[in-house]
């Protein structure tokens, strides 16, 4: 017990250290900037100084964005942590294949529900309160999953966590986008995706460390330890301000919005505050043609283009096969002849690659733009998936791991970095949560369907056929990006 407890505490102290180092980086940035204003700003990537604002304001913006984005860490952790416990659960409770499927998929169906209903609390109760309740859902799910005594208690607990995941994909990117200035919005909103990938990697490492304890209750620790970061995230959400855009759009509270803007940057002048408030309230002027879509029903012709973009960017995200490849990576590697242990090691390598190239995507998104990253990612998809299909068809198996790693890199710096940012930018204030919910629901329903179909497809079709299909879909994706997607880099929200 002492060994398991030491492993657990050591792992999560490390996680807390990572979070603390990010916050220390923001404060260190302030000290360096004030002491050596002429020095290069090496930490600008994580906490960029927004042109026209003070360093203090930039740090607050980064801290609030990071706090909201930690919902993504829990999202990634919660989604992948089950991989270390599913075999033990099936044997422990003697589950049939159907019951096993219920246990494993319960969280995924929770995300579908969460993405469907996420717009309601986000608009009705506010972004801040919704983020706080997301943390509570994660906390309840983690503790309950670790203490579950059977299939149905376990499935309900995982379903609750899935609801939190689904709502987080609606609220967190939206909240960050509404706080951020146009020329830094991509990088800050992209923190959500970066934390998803970080959560996935930490979950894989956590499972590996806890599994070494050899305890029959190791699976309970794997699931239960999520309570630590969930509790930290929930506590941090208490200090978040409400989105000034929500205060204006849904509460007509210009004074409250003014206070948030003043808290963000105490050094701002009254004249600048008036200008910022005028920009927030401009979208309520129905007499201006550019604002009429804000007051039209969501399912209306004026919103047809952003609705189509939100649906298709989420649809093509899944049609790349990324979730199937992430979930079933060991099985794919075993098809090439790798032993099970080597296949698992390759899977951890996927997590590391995903993290590194997500960071690259965040660095590029406000430099090259969203559409450019989607195009670059599409070319990477087509090349890696096409080569992978060829490698399977010619039995050149040594190429397959490299193709999979290249595919993950293309996804991480392309679609993965862009999807949540783009959806949060293309809708007006009154419909932003609806649009985010549409994109999130589309993402999760196709993820669920693909996860359901992929194991069957692997047994019914040759690998080259499956990868060839994904490659064809990414060719369609590239044509769609060229034809329909408009660049949103640096464009103010409406």
Tell where the protein language model's regions lie, with residue ranges.
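Alpha-helical transmembrane bundle of multi-pass membrane proteins
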Residues: 25, 42-262, 285-494
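Short intracellular "coupling" helices and adjacent cytoplasmic loop segments at the cytosolic face
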Residues: 263-274
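Cytosol/matrix-facing amphipathic helices and coiled-coil assembly/linker segments
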Residues: 273-287
């Amino acid at each position: 017990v002492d060994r398991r407890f030491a492993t657990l505490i050591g792992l999560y102290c490390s996680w807390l250290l990572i979070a603390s180092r990010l916050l220390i980086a923001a404060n260190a940035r302030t000290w360096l900037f004030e002491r050596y204003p002429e020095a290069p700003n090496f930490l600008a990537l994580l906490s960029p100084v927004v042109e026209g604002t003070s360093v203090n304001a930039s740090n607050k913006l980064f801290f609030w964005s990071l706090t909201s984005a930690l919902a993504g860490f829990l999202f990634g952790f919660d989604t992948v942590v089950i991989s270390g416990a599913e075999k033990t659960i099936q044997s422990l409770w003697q589950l049939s294949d159907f019951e096993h499927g219920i246990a494993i998929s319960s969280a995924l169906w929770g995300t579908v529900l969460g993405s469907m209903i996420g717009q309601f609390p986000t608009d009705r109760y506010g972004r801040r309160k919704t983020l706080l309740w997301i943390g509570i859902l994660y906390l309840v799910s983690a503790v309950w999953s670790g203490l579950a005594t059977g299939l149905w208690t376990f499935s309900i607990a995982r379903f609750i966590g899935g609801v939190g995941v689904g709502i987080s994909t609606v609220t967190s990117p939206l909240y960050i986008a509404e706080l951020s200035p146009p020329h830094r919005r991509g990088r800050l909103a992209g923190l959500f995706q970066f934390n998803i990938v970080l959560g996935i990697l930490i979950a894989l490492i956590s499972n590996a460390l806890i599994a070494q304890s050899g305890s029959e209750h190791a699976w309970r620790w794997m699931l239960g330890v999520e309570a630590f970061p969930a509790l930290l995230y929930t506590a941090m959400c208490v200090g978040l301000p409400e989105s000034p855009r929500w205060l204006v759009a849904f509460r007509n509270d210009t004074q409250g919005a003014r206070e948030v803007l003043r808290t963000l940057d105490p050094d701002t002048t009254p004249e600048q505050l008036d200008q910022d408030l005028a920009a927030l309230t401009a979208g309520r002027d129905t007499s201006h043609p550019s604002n009429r879509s804000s007051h039209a029903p969501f399912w209306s012709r004026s919103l047809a283009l952003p609705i189509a973009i939100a649906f298709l960017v989420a649809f093509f995200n899944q049609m790349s096969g990324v979730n199937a490849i992430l979930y079933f990576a060991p099985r794919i590697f075993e098809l090439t002849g790798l032993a099970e242990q080597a296949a698992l090691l390759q899977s951890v390598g996927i997590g590391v690659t995903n993290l590194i190239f997500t960071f690259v995507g965040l660095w590029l998104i406000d430099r090259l733009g969203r559409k450019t990253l989607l195009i670059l990612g599409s070319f990477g998809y087509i090349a890696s998936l096409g080569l992978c299909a060829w490698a399977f068809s010619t039995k050149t198996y040594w190429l397959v791991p490299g193709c999979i790693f290249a595919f993950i890199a293309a996804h991480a710096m392309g679609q993965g970095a862009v999807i949540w940012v783009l959806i949060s930018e293309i809708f007006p204030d009154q419909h932003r949560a609806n649009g985010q919910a549409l994109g999130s629901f589309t993402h999760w329903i196709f993820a669920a369907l693909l996860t359901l179909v992929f194991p069957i497809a692997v047994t019914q079709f040759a690998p080259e056929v499956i990868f060839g299909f994904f490659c064809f879909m990414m060719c369609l994706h590239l044509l769609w990006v060229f034809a329909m997607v408009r660049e949103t880099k640096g464009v103010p929200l409406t």
